[in-house]
């Protein structure tokens, strides 16, 4: 095969060599005539759409998340809420910074010109973003749960210092869970094709132990990075919803924004995990199709990193207000502590504390 490899011959393994995380086996000599696969035109369409989505995510994500960090982290008074949103924006910004390398990787038909160090670092940044983002969303949900369900505890323990410590813990856990990506990634040079690939080394080392380790990594990623956070967040908002619907708290726009942000995260990352499972455990025909669609799933995960600032703008004000006020005012309203909620929490906390005191005095 010559230096200028035909698009259809190489694109079949695109998803397995893509700069972000890949899951299963890949076939370097993909057969475009395989009836279970997509046509060459289908691959080209996925190729173009992936570039478009990544480009949009890059431009909006870098500018939007940088603006969020500037507003919530620099211009506004430091609160627990602003710390959560700054941490979420920092995770998304980190991911968006790596997108240009991904776009170049797509354009170069998965050729990896950046060396082995970057092969280990860049894919790991995407995994780190996933864990840091979802763990931050869990913290936000638990924080809202404490404010509504455990107001006395929130009044006594909810602090900026604790928020910073928890955000630090999020990054430590994210880094630890991203380490396998660094360990198992390496570059493979194919001189006959004039191409260098960034892949998992289990694609070269097919020993049973190595294969099992990779599968364990992906299952762990699915459970800790998707299923458990989804369960925790769902339970938190189910209980919050019951309390709000009881009429004891007014429905707050802040809750609506956070719910949409959480829902968007899981919708954007669901295809990534589903396709990964199909590639790892599905039948051969399903694996081929999943590999072909994998770039779209990865691009959709990238898009999630640019959506939050957009959601803050479109949900932070009514439409007429959005026209009249500056973006800074919109963001400040989104990130500010909810006065009505805090008043309700404080009143309920005082009421509970008063009842507890009266009960103690009666017993004496």
From Swiss-Prot:
Residues 1-50, 104-120, 181-220, 278-295 are extracellular. One of its GO terms (molecular function) is G protein-coupled receptor activity. Keywords: Cell membrane, Chemotaxis, Disulfide bond, G-protein coupled receptor, Glycoprotein, Membrane, Receptor, Transducer, Transmembrane, Transmembrane helix. Glycans are attached at residues 13, 34. GO terms for cellular component: plasma membrane. Pfam families: 7tm_1 (PF00001). Receptor for the chemotactic and inflammatory peptide anaphylatoxin C3a. This receptor stimulates chemotaxis, granule enzyme release and superoxide anion production. Belongs to the G-protein coupled receptor 1 family. This is C3a anaphylatoxin chemotactic receptor. It comes from Oncorhynchus mykiss (Rainbow trout).
């Amino acid at each position: 095969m010559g230096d200028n490899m035909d698009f259809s011959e190489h694109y079949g393994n695109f998803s397995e060599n893509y700069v972000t995380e890949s899951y299963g086996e890949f076939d370097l000599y993909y057969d475009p005539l395989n009836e279970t696969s997509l046509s060459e035109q289908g691959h080209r369409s996925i190729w173009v759409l992936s570039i478009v989505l990544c480009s949009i995510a890059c431009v909006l994500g870098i500018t939007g998340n940088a603006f969020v960090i500037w507003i919530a982290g620099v211009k506004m008074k430091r609160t627990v809420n602003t710390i959560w949103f700054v941490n979420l924006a920092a995770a998304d910004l980190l991911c968006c910074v790596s997108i240009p390398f991904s776009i170049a990787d797509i354009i170069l038909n998965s050729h990896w010109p950046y060396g082995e160090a970057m092969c280990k670092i860049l894919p790991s940044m995407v995994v780190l973003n996933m864990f840091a983002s979802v763990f931050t969303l869990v913290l936000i949900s638990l924080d809202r749960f404490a404010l509504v369900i455990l107001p006395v505890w929130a009044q006594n323990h909810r602090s900026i210092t604790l928020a910073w410590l928890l955000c630090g813990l999020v990054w430590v856990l994210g880094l630890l869970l991203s380490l396998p990506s660094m360990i198992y990634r390496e570059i493979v040079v194919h001189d006959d094709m004039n191409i260098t690939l960034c892949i998992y080394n289990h694609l070269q080392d097919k020993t049973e132990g190595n294969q099992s380790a990779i599968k364990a990594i992906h299952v762990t990623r699915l459970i800790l990075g998707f299923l458990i956070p989804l369960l925790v967040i769902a339970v938190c908002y189910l209980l919050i919803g019951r309390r709000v619907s009881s009429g004891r708290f007014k429905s707050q726009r802040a809750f609506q924004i956070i719910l949409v942000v959480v829902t968007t995260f899981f919708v954007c990352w669901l295809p990534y995990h589903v396709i990964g499972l199909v590639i790892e455990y599905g039948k051969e025909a399903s694996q081929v199709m999943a590999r072909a669609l994998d770039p779209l799933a990865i691009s959709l995960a990238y898009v999630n990193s640019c959506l939050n600032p957009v959601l803050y703008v479109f949900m932070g004000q009514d439409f007429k207000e959005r026209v009249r006020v500056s973006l800074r005012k919109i963001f400040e309203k989104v990130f500010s502590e909810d006065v009505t909620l805090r008043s309700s929490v404080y009143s309920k906390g005082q009421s509970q504390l008063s009842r507890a005191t009266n009960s103690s005095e009666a017993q004496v």
